[in-house]
Amino acid sequence: QPTYVSSRHYYLHMDTTAYGDFDFRNPRYHELQCWNVPGFIRIEAAPTFVELLEKLTAFLGRQPELPEWIYNGLIIGAQGGNERSFGIVDKSLEHGIKVSGLWCQDWCGKRVTSFGKRLQWDWHFHKEMYPDLPKHIEELHARGIKFLGYVNPYLVNDGELYAEGKKRGVFAKKADGSDYLVDFGEFYCGVVDFTNPEAYNWFKDEVIKKYTLDIGIDGWMADFGEYLPTDDLVLANGVSPMIEHNHWPVLWAKCNYDAVKESGKLGQVVYFMRAGGTGSQKYCTLLWAGDQSVDFSRHDGLCTVICAALSSGMVGCGLNHCDI
């Protein structure tokens, strides 16, 4: 996002999604670069940082309010299927731990590669690892505990949803007209083309609503958004992927937001994201700092989480969290 906040109590924002960078090394001036002509450059000032942030978020958008349940206990991250994941909840409660949610990112199944276990990128509950998941979610709800899963904007090319999406023509193309497949490490995935209204609505309605919200899921990691390829990928709207790349996280956030809002569950459901761009603030219920090292190292440990929280908060994503 091409925005910075100055210690002199002003912010500057460039209206562009092209590649850009800011150079603050010279004490007398700032050097701004972007690979197109921005629509405008916006500067606003205020007496205090609080007032300045009010102005900036009024311009960029503000995050939806979080539901009360997210503050009422631990959200446990567990994997391995029904017995193990729900068993950890039971043990936690037995030991007096207050639990508000269970996050099972492998609710969709696992995929074994030569370098470890990955998820099965086919966004519906895995009937072998999580049989009768909707029933188990109901049982959690009866105990006042929420269930969270995982979704990202790609579909693995040997999955059920990819086959359905291919019939509907929802994937971004290569220059030769074939589906653009991304290599994610021993498996390939189609890129759902959110610039195509039919593809956008299909993913929103037939994937997020049908396979997550409709079975009672209360939240999910809405992962990725930052990986749009920029070589020979062709989008439905005709815009170069070099320009659309930094806008992609906004489209991904909006797709999740629209699914939740249209289902009447805004303020009840929480999805957390690791990517963002100009305008994603109003569509992102919670920002996630990414995969840090569980240590105090300078470049990827606890201190980086603090920097990320402060920086994201200063550009309108004050609701954020990190893994423990």
What spans do the regions from the language model cover?
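Catalytic-domain carbohydrate-binding cleft regions of carbohydrate-active enzymes
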Residues: Q1-I324
